[in-house]
Structure formats: C-alpha cells, structure tokens
C-alpha cells in the first residue's frame, strides 16, 4: 500500500526514524511539536502497517498489549526482507524450475495480474464491493451461481434490494463501521481490524418461468439464500491520500455450510386482528416471512384453518371459544391445538389474544391475537415401520403404549395412533403390516394377536415397511411414529389421524375421519378405534392393558390427551371415561384367558366398545352407546354404517385375539388388535362411510348419535360393559354438536375420497354393510364375523326396517342387491346376536378343532360367510372382516395347533404370519369363495395347515396368503363387485368348468379386486415384493407361489389363488363337503347374477368397473381392474402393481386367452385354474380338457409315484383340486367329500410326487445342467424330472415340454409338485419361485419353455439359459434385475397362473399360467395361441435352445409380464 511503501521504501531511513522516534513515541516530544500533523498521519500509517503485517498472522492476537511502533516497524522490515529474499531465490531458480518441468514453489511465480482472477475463481462464493451509499460497485460474474442474478443486473444496484429486510441493519453496521482505522482499533475492542464476518439473507432471483411461483407465489418471489459474508472496509488512508475513491465494503459471500447454519427456531408466530365478531380483519406474517422457514405460508394457513374450524364432538371451534374468553376476560390463552403440515410435520399451536379498547370511550374495538407455533420434529416418519419391532417400543411410548402420551404430544394421540393403525390398515398389506408391526408396534394388539402373523413380522414387517414406506407414508406402521405419521392433523382430529399415510389425505380417512371422526369428536376416538386398536395392539404386544376406553373414552380425554396410553394412560382416560373402558381396557388384557365364549362376548362387546373407538367417530360412538340403546332402533341404517366404521376394526381386532384376547377384546380394546390389522382396509371404508354419514346426517351430533346407536346397539346388546363407554361417548357427544365442522369435514372427506378414487367409495358402502355384520360379531373367527356379516345382511332380513334404513343409507351399496346376490347369506344371518354367538362358538370350535364337521350353524355361518364374503367382497368387509376373521381363525388354529397363539407356525414363516393377518382376511374371502363350502373350516383349515405345517410355513403361508387375500378381498371387496362383474365372463367359464371354477372366478375377481384394493390400501407391489424375497427364502415354493401371487396380484390374490385350493384340499376333508358345495353354488349364483353385481357396482359408483365387468374380455377386465386399481392408488403401487397387473395381465392377455388373462393374470390363482379350463379351452379347450383329464390322471399317477411331502403339497393339492376342479368342471356334482377325497389323494400324490420331484429335481438339475450344456430338450430332461410332465412332453418333446405345460395343466400339477418339490428342496430362494418352476432343470428344460410362455417365460428361458437349472431360473436373464426375483417373478407370474393352482396349479401355472404361454407354447399342441406358438414356433424355443433368448420373441409379452412381476416381486 502507499502507506506501507512510504514507510518501508527506505529501510535504512525507517530504521533511523525508528531509533530516533521510538523514545519520542513513548512520550510527547517538543522536537515533534511542529510535526504534530505529520506524526498523526504517521501514526495512522503505522497502525495500518501493523494491520497489514499481522493480517495473515495470528501473532497480533497473541499480544497482551498494544504493540508499539518500534515493534511494528521491526516486524515490517523483517517481512519485507523475507519477501525480497524469496523473490531473489525465485528469480535465480526460475529457469531451472521451468526447465525441469516442476511447478514453481516460489511466491513470485504467479503473475500479479493473474492472481486476482485466479483467486476469484477459487472463491467459494462471489465477490462484490459496496460503496457508502449501499450501491454495488462491483460484483463477480459467479454471482449467478448463487443468486441467479447476472453481473449486469446487480451492478450499480442498491445492495439493499437483494438483502433481506431483516439484515439491513447488520449490513449497515458493517458498511459504516465506527472508525476502525483512525485510532479506534487499539482500544481493545474485539474488531481490531476492519474485516468482519456476518451472515445475511440475499434474495434469489425467481426463475424466469416462474416455476416456483406455481408452488408459492410469494415465496417464489421471496426466496432468500443465507450467505456468509466476509467484509473488509476500504482503508480510509486511500481517500486521505487524495485519491478519488470512496471508502467501501469489499465482501466475499458464500453459502453458509449446512453444519454452520444455525438451527432455525422451532417457535414461530404471526399476528391477526379480529373484529368483535371474531372475523379476521388483518393478518401479519412478517415475522414468519422474515424467518424464511420453509412452508411458513402453509403453516399460517393450516393454523388458521385448525383454529377456526369446528371439530366433531365440540360445540365451538377453538377460535370461537377463545374469542368468548377474550371478550369476557380481556386477555386469554387458547388451549394447545395441533395440526399437521402438508409434509406431515406436526405443529403445536397456541393463541394468545388481547382485547383492545378505545382509549376515549373504553369500548372494545378489536382483538389482537398472537399465534405461537411450534413445529415438532418428525420423530418416526417411516422409521417406525422400518424399526418394526423396535417400533413396538417407539409406538408404545408414542402411540401404542401411551396413546395418552400421544395425546399429550398431539392432543389426539389416539387419533394419531389410530391413524398409524389405519394407515397400516388402509392397505391390506398394512394389515399385515399391522400384524408384523404389531409386534413391532407392540401396540398393534390385533397384530400381536396375530403374533403368528407376527411370525410373519419379518415378512409382515417387510410388507408393512413396503406398505408403509410408500405410505408411506407409510404411516401405516407409523403408529409408533405419532409425530410424523400421526401428523398433527392426525392428532388434531380423527380426520387428521387419517392422514398419516399420506399425511393428510392419501387415505382421506384422515380428512374424512377428520370430518366424520371429528363428528364423533373423539378425534382420538374415531381413530380412537384405530387408535384403540393400535393401542390395544401395542399394549398387547407390550403386555400392557390397553383400553379402548381411553380412545373410546371421551373425546375430551382424547382432546386432553384423554387417549392417554390405552395401556399406561388407561386408568386416567378410563376415569374420565367414567370407567367406561377402564375395566374393559384392563379386562382386555386382564381377562384374556376367558374362553371362546368370553371371546365371542368380548368380540361383541369389544366390538361395541371398539366400534365406537374404531369408528371414525369414537366419541359419538361412545356417546351414542349411552344414547344408542334408546335410539338404536331409530336409525339402524346409519347405525349400521357407524357400526361398519366401528366394527371393522373391531372385527379385525377380535379375530387376532380369539382366545387370549377374547376377554381383552370384550373388556377393552381386545378387538383393538384386530382393528390394527384391519385399519388399513377399513380406514378407507370407514372414511367412505363417514362421508356417507355426513351426507345422510345433518350434523356431527347426529353422527354421534348414529354412532352411539350403531355402537351402542351392539355394545349395549352384546355387553353392558360398554355402558360406561356410552357415558364417555355421551360426554363427547356434547362436543359433537359442532356442525360447522360438517362442511369442512365433508370437504375433507370429499377431498380424501377423491384420493380413494372409485374403489374406496365402493369399499365404504360395502363396508357399511360389513359394519352391520361386523357389530354383531366382533368375534375373532372369520366365521363369526362372517356370520355377523351375514347378520348384517340378516338384519336386512330380520328387521326389515333396519335393512331398509341401511339400504337407504347405503343406496350405493345396494344392500338389497347384496342379499339378493347372496340370499342364503341373509337367511343364514337372520339369527340374532345369540345365533351369531352360537355361530361364532361353532366357528371357534371349527377353528380350534379344525374338524371337518362343523355345527350346522357354523357351517351356515361359513356358507354365509363365503356368500357374505363373496357377497361382501366388494364391501371390503371381507377384507376387513374376513381378514380379521381369518386372522382370528388362523390365530385360533395356530393357537390350538401351534403351541403359540399364532407365532409358532406363522413365526416360523414370517410370510405366513403376515400374509395371514392381511392375507388371511383375503384367505377368508378366497377361502370362503374358493372354499365357500369350507369357508370357515377352510379358513380354519388353512390356519390349521399353518399350524400343522410350521416347517412348511409356506403351506400355512398359503392360508396366510389367503387371509391376506381375504383381507385384501375385503378391502378389495368393493372392487370385487366390479371385479366380479368384470370377471364374470372369465369367472362364468370357470363356473361352467366346475364349482372350483366358480371359486376360481371369485378368486380372480377377488384377485383383481385385490390388487386394486392393495393398491388402494398399500399397493400390492410392496407387499408383493416383500413377499417375493421372503418367498425366496421360504422353503415352501407353492405356498410361496401363492405369496408371490399375492405379491403379483396383491398378496391377497395369492391367498386366493392358492389358499382357496389349499383350503379346499385340506378343508373339504376337514369341513363337511356340503358346505363347500353350497358355498360354491351360492358363489355360482352370486357370480351368475351379473345384473345384481352390476347394480351393486353402480351403487358403489363403479360404472366403469361395471362396464368392464360386462365386457366379455377378461383381459380388459383384468387390465382395467389393474388399471383401475392403479388409478385408484397409482401413487401407492401404481408402478409395481400396475406393471404387474397391467403388464402381467396385459402380457397374459395377449399371451393367454382372455379368460386366461382375466383369471390368470389378475386372479392369478383363479386365472390359472380357470385359464387351463376356460382359458385353454377357448384356445385349445379340447386339448386342454383332455390335457386336464390326462393331467389329473397323471397327477394321480405322479402323486403316487412322487410322494414327496412338500409345502407345495398343499399348493399342489389346491393345484390338484384346481386341476381336478377344472378337469371336473362337468363334475360340479362332485360333492365336497369327493373333492376332499380327491384333494387328499392329490395331496398324497403331490407329497409323493414332490418327494419324487425332489429326488428328480436333483436328477433334473443334473440333467438340466447337462441338457443345458447339451441343449437337451426339456422333454429329454423332463423324463427324469417330470414323471407327470413326461407324458405331455412326450407329445412334442421340445415343444411338448413347453406344450406339456399347457397341457401341463395336469402335468403342471404333476410336475408342479415335482418341480415345486425339486425346486423347493434345491434352493429355498429358488424354491419360492422355483417351486413353480418345479425344478430349475425341469424348468429350464421343460418348465423353462413352459415357464417362458408363462408370465416370465422369457425370464425363465434366460434363466434356463443361465445353465443352472435352478439358478438359471433364478438367473435374472429374464428377470435380469431379479435373479432371485426371477424365481419370484416367475413365481409371481406363475403365481398368477399358479395362484389358481397354488401348488400343482402353481406349477401348472408355471406351465399353463406360465402363460398359458406354455399352453400357447403348447398352443400348437393345445391350441392356446398367441404367445405359445410364437415361442414354440421359435426354433430356438423348440430346439435345444429351450433356454435361449430366442424363446423371448414370443415371450416378450411374458417378459413384460415377468418384468411387471419383478416389480411386484
């Protein structure tokens, strides 16, 4: 600098001056008196020199005293000498350095002119200079990278135009510092130098296309970037030198590193002014705008909405109540209220208001309010799911163990928990989630009950995770994550609770619950039911006594953290509840040992209790309980709706705890556990029901009353224990009066409904019907529930007025139509609660004994159940009731069979368990459909199978899958109507084939619905995918196949596919054959009644589905269904599921007959069965039938030959049954006994075959390996591996191998067990998929071509190409992505086909469903066209290159299908 130059230009002079001036500087000197001015200026230069010298050194900071001029000058001279020496050395070495190509290390190497630009480029920020007027004198070009402004745009522009208004003062302080240079720097003040570092917010230029404006106009224009500025003031000495420069601030600005960014304050506030009527006249959000926290506008909006919205169960909104207090007291604080932001963040808010009076007249003029907001951290966004078991604890603290805590956190923790529960529940998968998370949730009592399911917890957890993760939000499992999942919204209101999954509205239950639940006003209660169920489940898992009471307890409790943990907080809430549930709560856990009778009672009573809780309007439910007794008969229709809302969870809950929780349910939320699992399914349904209730009822109070009636009726009827609940509810009812909330609630409901799309609407309506049935039977057993369901239909028969009311309320549901479809169901149901209980007891006995003979009542109940199930598949009641019922059944069975209630068998196979909770319900549906006769027993049998087949977890898994299917079906039941209608064409042929065909038809329909339902709930793909991996690990290929099927179709479908057959195989024996025949007949009638179905669909608002159902093309139906499902829940599982259903179906559609498509793809299970019969028949019916007969014969022969006990046996049995059934479509007369015998024979055969196949698989593998090496035709390899397939392969060996599989219908059954067996034994991972494949070798040689035609034929073909028969299948060539998945994909696709023939058929499906491509492949043989011929015709396929990709040409669609399956896998 000039100063430095002056002082140091002459070192000798400087030294001299220093020596001479040192003494003088220490004190005044007369000699210098005349040079005072020069001295002052010299001092300035010295100070500046000191700063320059020490600028790059910290030495100055080490001085404890101000360094004197002598020291400063001495240091200056020292540094100048060093610099000169370095420059000399650099100059001396520069030539050598450059010659040696070594970068110079001398400081003087960099050119002075280049240094500046280089430094600017290296800057982690931009450089700008501001003059005293605040104008930007210079800014570097890279400012565009930070603020999107061009250099020209900022030059000569006021810096304050880009600075946040809140930072102007700070910037001015730095721009105009107190004289830092004129002697003030030595005062000891911290800023000794004129350099400073400070943070400021700079405006980021809005995008030119206003992309951001679309999101938030204001925020888009006011987006600020926090910059860290290092500023240096231009030395005044320059100006004093006479230069024409102004003092300026030189700054380097960079983004503040995340780690250095100060944590944004969690508290925010904004101010409003209201007139004396409480209307907002002014809104000041400047403080929040200045804070620049993301989402502040949404925060303000939602806060005002929450504050001024009237909530159900409350006469006044927070704002009105607070306004009255302010006018009365002059100053008031509102209670803390909570809500959630669009991103799910929970916010706790409190408003402080003051009345402002005129200074002159002292008259009140206005009210000023400060709204203080605190954002709560998202504690468990998706982690609870992921943490699964850990979740139990988190949930326990947050949601399950202490809804009260939740309540404390959110005020409506119950809601939140319920939400989480609901979220789980919303997807059938979530139900499974619940089951697995239950353990995880600990609070998922129902799931815990389904501990066996919990065995599936790993799977379930996976499922749950997947389900949740999408969910997303998966708030499904999020009960444990009350904060995030149970967004404040959830907590805030029952409706809010509904939003955990998709924070507010994915399941609209939140919104809808918000409204309806709000109507009940036990925000917590509405979710309370869910919450209760969750709490109960959690408490159960934790061993705590959870009381629905708290949730049920009054909304007051809920509001005031009344949802105190159902477990821990129970007593207080119960106290508030008036001990409504306190007994029940603890009774729930205290009296779990009561007998089944107690259970039945508990089922009813807990249902009643839980219904209120479960219902979105728990409070109203509770209140209505008290009033419900008197008013119960006044509006039974709406009561039914409310019961639906309340019972669905209840049904689920009781089912999980048939024995141990029977009393718990009775006394407490014993039924809660069930709701946890059913929440996902019932949430939407309830949401729809609530929506309808809102429409039907004039006010929340009415809803509350209705709820009371709905819950009170059953509750009061079933047990007096609910009376306290009634009281509590009654307490809440006063709060219910809020009618203003109706508009908002309706809006929310409508809004959420939109999200639910068509299916949810269907579901609620159906669900309402289900509710009717549910209230009566909260029993654990599906049969009981079904019976109740029937009862609900019965009510139609019994109390015509009630039915009429219900029909009126549920016009869309067309209650009358459902009964018409299933007249038997109603007649069966006419029995009162006593009959229901009797039926329940019978079912319990069936479950416990799993004896083929069931009480007539039980059988009727089962029949009704199947009918009802079938009837109500659309309602989704099955999904809920059946799932719940199924769960109870499975649980019960497992409890009896496996020492553990459910864990023994289910735990052995995590999938088994999970599929059971979620899939069991479906199983119930499918079982009831597939095993209509065996419905209850089938379910039980399924459970029993699980219990008996702990090692073959997959077999139980089949049932589990079935359960899932049933649950899904229940959830899907709504779609099922449409699906049934859609698939009637496909299903009709099936029916034509045989009763099994009917079953198949139902199952495909259910399956079709299942995917959509799953998608709606959680998305089948997630579960599917999760299932697939577990399948890989599972040693039970066929069971796995069903699971895959479920994954493909939607876990639920699997169960349909395989579980119905499995159930039929074992269950026909266990169950009186008459039931199966009757159920089949009923199913046939119901399915045949397309008009009724169509009407129901129309009532459900599914004209599209109806039209689709009318369409004869199953392809369309399946694809449409999948599409619809995807549309309904595309976000949840659109890709996976859509691709699976659409792609797989689409692929199948082109590849297979439409029938095949419909049945094979969507209904995987049914499809395969149907397809081989109807599907193949249309294409090559003649061949298929003979093939079927041949296959049947082969199956028997092979079964005898190959007696290998394999889980696939069950699948195989079902396959055989399917085969037999398809083979015996004309054998419809065959009674259940005959079928049972056949099934037994088939099972034995399959056992033998599988043993043989296992042995053969090794051989086949070796042969396949050799064959692959030799390109042996599958037939060449098949002979060893495919005794049954051999016959078909014999037809066209290369093609025959493929074709045999189309004919392989039977062969597939034969080989299926063998393949399955071989596959299963060969590799657990492979076995899940390979099970279908049969043996990798077989698959490659035979199955491969067949498989290739099958859904994943290409994948399989490539897999075969892989070389390892087993691993080649696994090899991802076709499934590329999924080496293991390829098995799963194949399995899945195969499952699609396999789904129908779970074991044998699953393999068969491999072969037939394999695409009917196999059949197609065998098209030349069988006449199946499309894929098959292409593949078969493909020389590569026919030739030794069975495994070559040449098979792919005809298999492209299959490959797509496979890909789709992969997605699901």
Swiss-Prot record:
Stretch forming the signal peptide: none
Recorded GO MF terms: aryl hydrocarbon receptor binding; chromatin binding; DNA polymerase binding; nuclear estrogen receptor binding; nuclear glucocorticoid receptor binding; nuclear receptor binding; nuclear retinoic acid receptor binding; nuclear retinoid X receptor binding
Omega-N-methylarginine modification, residue list: 1261
PTM: Acetylated. Deacetylation at Lys-780 by SIRT6 stimulates its ability to coactivate PPARA.
Compositional bias (Low complexity): 638-648
Residue numbers of N-acetylserine PTMs: 2
Biased composition (Polar residues): 1-11, 451-486, 658-671, 1311-1325
Region span, CASP8AP2-binding: 691-743
Chief place where the protein resides: nucleus
Keyword Transcription regulation tagged: yes
Domain PAS span(s) in chain numbering: 119-183
Residue stretches of biased makeup (Basic and acidic residues): 622-637
In-chain residues carrying the UniProt-annotated modification Phosphoserine: 29, 396, 487, 493, 499, 554, 565, 682, 699, 736, 771
ATP-binding as UniProt keyword: no
Record text about domains: Contains four Leu-Xaa-Xaa-Leu-Leu (LXXLL) motifs. The LXXLL motifs are essential for the association with nuclear receptors and are, at least in part, functionally redundant.
Protein task: Transcriptional coactivator for steroid receptors and nuclear receptors. Coactivator of the steroid binding domain (AF-2) but not of the modulating N-terminal domain (AF-1). Required with NCOA1 to control energy balance between white and brown adipose tissues. Critical regulator of glucose metabolism regulation, acts as a RORA coactivator to specifically modulate G6PC1 expression. Involved in the positive regulation of the transcriptional activity of the glucocorticoid receptor NR3C1 by sumoylation enhancer RWDD3.
Protein's recorded name: Nuclear receptor coactivator 2
Organism: Rattus norvegicus
The gene coding this protein: Ncoa2
């Amino acid at each position: 600098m000039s100063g430095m130059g002056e002082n140091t230009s002459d070192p000798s002079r400087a030294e001299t001056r220093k020596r001479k001036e040192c003494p003088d500087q220490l004190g005044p000197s007369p000699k210098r008196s005349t040079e005072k001015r020069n001295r002052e200026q010299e001092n300035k230069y010295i100070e500046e020199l000191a700063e320059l010298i020490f600028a790059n050194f910290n030495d100055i900071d080490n001085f404890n005293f101000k360094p004197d001029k002598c020291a400063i000058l001495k240091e200056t001279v020292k540094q100048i000498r060093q610099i000169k020496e370095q420059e000399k050395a650099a100059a001396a070495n520069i030539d050598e350095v450059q010659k040696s190509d070594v970068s110079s290390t001398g400081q003087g190497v960099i050119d002075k002119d280049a240094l500046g630009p280089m430094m600017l480029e290296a800057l982690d920020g931009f450089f700008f200079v501001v003059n005293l007027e605040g104008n930007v004198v210079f800014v570097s070009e890279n400012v565009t990278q930070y603020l999107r402004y061009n250099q020209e745009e900022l030059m000569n522009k006021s810096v304050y135009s880009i600075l946040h208004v809140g930072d102007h003062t700070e910037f001015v302080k730095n721009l105009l510092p107190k004289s830092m240079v004129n002697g003030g720097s030595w005062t000891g003040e911290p800023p000794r130098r004129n350099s400073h570092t400070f943070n400021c917010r700079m405006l980021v230029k809005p995008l030119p296309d206003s992309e951001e404006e679309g999101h938030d106009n204001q925020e888009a224009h006011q987006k600020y970037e926090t910059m860290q500025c290092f500023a240096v003031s231009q030395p005044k000495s320059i100006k004093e030198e006479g230069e024409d420069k102004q003092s300026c601030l030189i700054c380097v600005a960079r983004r503040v590193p995340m780690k250095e960014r100060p944590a944004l304050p969690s508290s925010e506030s904004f101010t409003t002014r209201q007139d004396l009527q409480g209307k907002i006249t002014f809104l000041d959000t400047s403080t929040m705008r200045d804070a620049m926290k993301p989402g502040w506008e949404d925060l303000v909006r939602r806060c005002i909405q929450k504050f001024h919205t009237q909530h159900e169960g409350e006469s006044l909104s927070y704002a009105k109540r607070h306004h009255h207090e302010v006018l009365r007291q002059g100053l008031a604080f509102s209670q803390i209220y909570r809500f959630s932001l669009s991103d799910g963040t929970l916010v706790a808010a409190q408003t402080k208001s003051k009345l402002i009076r005129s200074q002159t007249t002292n008259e009140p003029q206005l009210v000023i309010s400060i709204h203080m907001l605190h954002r709560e951290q998202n504690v468990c966004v998706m982690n609870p799911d992921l943490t699964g078991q850990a979740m139990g604890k988190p949930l326990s603290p947050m949601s399950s163990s202490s809804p009260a805590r939740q309540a404390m956190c959110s005020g409506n923790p119950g809601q939140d928990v319920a939400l989480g529960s609901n979220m789980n529940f919303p997807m059938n998968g979530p139900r499974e989630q619940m089951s697995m998370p239950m353990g995880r949730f600990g609070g998922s009592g129902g799931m815990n009950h389904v501990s066996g399911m919990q065995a599936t917890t790993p799977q379930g957890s996976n499922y749950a995770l997947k389900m949740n993760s999408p969910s997303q939000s998966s708030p499904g499992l999020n009960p444990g994550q009350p904060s995030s999942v149970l967004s404040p919204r959830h907590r805030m209101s029952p409706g809010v609770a509904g939003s955990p999954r998709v924070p507010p509205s994915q399941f609209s239950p939140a919104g809808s619950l918000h409204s309806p639940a709000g109507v009940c006003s036990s925000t917590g209660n509405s979710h309370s039911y869910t919450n209760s169920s969750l709490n109960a489940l959690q408490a159960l898992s934790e061993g705590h006594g959870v009381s629905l009471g708290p949730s049920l307890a009054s909304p007051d409790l809920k509001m005031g953290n009344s949802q105190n943990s159902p477990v821990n907080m129970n007593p207080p809430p119960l106290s508030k509840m008036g001990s409504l549930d306190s007994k029940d709560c603890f009774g729930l856990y205290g009296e779990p040992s009561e007998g089944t009778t107690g259970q039945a009672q508990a089922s009813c009573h807990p249902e009643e209790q839980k219904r209120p809780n479960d219902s979105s309007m728990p409070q109203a439910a509770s209140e209505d309980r008290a009033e419900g007794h008197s008013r119960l008969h006044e509006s039974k229709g709406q009561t039914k709706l409310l019961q639906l809302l309340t019972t669905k969870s209840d049904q689920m809950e009781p089912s999980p705890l048939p024995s141990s929780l029977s009393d718990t349910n009775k006394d407490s939320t014993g039924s809660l556990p069930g709701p946890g699992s059913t929440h996902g399914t019932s949430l939407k349904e309830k949401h729809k029901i609530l929506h309808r209730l809102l429409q039907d009822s004039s006010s929340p109070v009415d809803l509350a009353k209705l709820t009371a009636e709905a819950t009170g009726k059953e509750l009061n009827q079933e047990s007096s224990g609910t009376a306290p609940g009634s009281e509590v509810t009654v307490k809440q009812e006063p709060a219910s009066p809020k009618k203003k909330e109706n508009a908002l609630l309706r809006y929310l409901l409508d809004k959420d409904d939109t999200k639910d799309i068509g299916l949810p609407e269907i579901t609620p309506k159906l669900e309402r019907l289900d509710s009717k049935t549910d209230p009566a039977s909260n029993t654990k057993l599906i049969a009981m529930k079904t019976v109740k369901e029937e009862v609900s239909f019965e009510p139609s028969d019994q109390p015509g007025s009630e039915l009429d009311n219900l029909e009126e309320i549920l016009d869309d549901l067309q209650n009358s139509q459902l009964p018409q479809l299933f007249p038997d169901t109603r007649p069966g149901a006419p029995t009162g609660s006593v009959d229901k209980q009797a039926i329940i007891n019978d079912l319990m006995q069936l479950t416990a004994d799993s004896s083929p003979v069931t009480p007539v009542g039980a059988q009727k109940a089962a029949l009704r159940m199947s009918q009802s199930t079938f009837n109500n598949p659309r309602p989704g009641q099955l999904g809920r009731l059946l799932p719940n019922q199924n769960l109870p059944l499975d649980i019960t069975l497992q409890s009896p069979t496996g020492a553990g209630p459910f864990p023994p068998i289910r735990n052995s196979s995590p999938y088994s368990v999970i599929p059971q909770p979620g899939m069991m319900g479906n199983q119930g549906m499918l079982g009831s459909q597939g095993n209509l006769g065996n419905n209850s027993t089938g379910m039980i049998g399924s459970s029993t199978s699980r219990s008996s087949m702990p090692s073959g977890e997959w077999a139980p898994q089949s049932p589990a899958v079935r359960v899932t299917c049933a649950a899904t079906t229940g959830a899907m039941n709504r779609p099922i109507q449409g699906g049934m209608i859609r698939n009637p064409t496909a299903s009709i042929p099936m029916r034509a084939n045989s009763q099994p065909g009917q079953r198949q038809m139902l199952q495909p329909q259910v399956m079709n619905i299942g995917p959509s339902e799953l998608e709606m709930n959680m998305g089948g793909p997630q579960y599917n995918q999760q299932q697939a991996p577990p399948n890989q690990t599972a040693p039970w290929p066929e069971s796995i196949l069903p699971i895959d099927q479920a994954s493909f179709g939607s876990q639920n479908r699997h169960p349909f596919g395989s579980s119905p057959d499995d159930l039929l195989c074992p269950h026909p024996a266990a169950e009186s054959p008459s039931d199966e025949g009757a159920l089949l007949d009923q199913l046939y009638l119901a399915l045949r009644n397309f008009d009724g179905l169509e009407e129901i669909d129309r009532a459900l608002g599914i004209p599209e589905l109806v039209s689709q159902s009318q369409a004869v093309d199953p392809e369309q139906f399946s694809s449409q269904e999948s599409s619809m499902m995807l549309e309904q829940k595309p976000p949840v599982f659109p890709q996976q599921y859509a691709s699976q259903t659409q792609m797989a179906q689409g692929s199948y559609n082109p590849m297979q007959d439409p029938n095949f498509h419909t049945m094979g793809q969507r209904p995987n299970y049914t499809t395969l069965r149907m397809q081989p019969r109807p599907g193949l028949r249309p294409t090559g019916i003649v061949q298929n039938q003979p093939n079927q007969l041949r296959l049947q014969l082969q199956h028997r022969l092979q079964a005898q030959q190959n007696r290998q006990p394999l889980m696939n046996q069950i699948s195989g049995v079902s396959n055989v049954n399917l085969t037999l059934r398809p083979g015996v479509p004309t054998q419809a007369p065959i009674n259940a006994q005959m079928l049972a015998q056949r099934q037994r024979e088939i099972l034995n055969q399959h056992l033998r075959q599988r043993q043989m196949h296992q042995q053969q698989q090794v051989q086949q593998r070796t042969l396949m390996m050799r064959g692959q090496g030799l390109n042996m035709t599958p037939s060449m390899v098949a002979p060893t591996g495919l005794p049954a397939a051999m016959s078909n392969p014999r037809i066209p060996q290369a093609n025959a191998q493929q074709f045999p599989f189309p004919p392989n219908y039977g062969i597939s059954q034969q080989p299926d067990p063998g393949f399955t067996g071989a596959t299963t034994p060969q590799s657990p991972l492979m076995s899940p998929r390979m099970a279908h494949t049969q043996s990798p070798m077989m698959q490659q040689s035979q199955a491969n071509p067949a498989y290739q035609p099958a859904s994943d034929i290409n994948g399989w073909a490539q897999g075969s190409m892989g070389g390892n028969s087993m691993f080649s299948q696994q090899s991802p060539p076709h499934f590329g992505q999924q080496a293991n998945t390829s098995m799963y994909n194949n399995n899945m696709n195969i499952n699609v086909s396999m789904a129908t023939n779970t074991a044998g058929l699953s393999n068969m499906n491999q072969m037939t469903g394999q695409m009917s491509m196999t059949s197609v492949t065998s098209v030349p043989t069988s006449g199946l066209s499309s894929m098959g011929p292409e593949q078969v015709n493909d020389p590569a396929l026919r030739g030794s290159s069975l495994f070559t990709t040449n098979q792919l040409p005809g298999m492209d669609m299959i490959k797509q299908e496979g890909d789709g399956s992969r997605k699901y896998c």
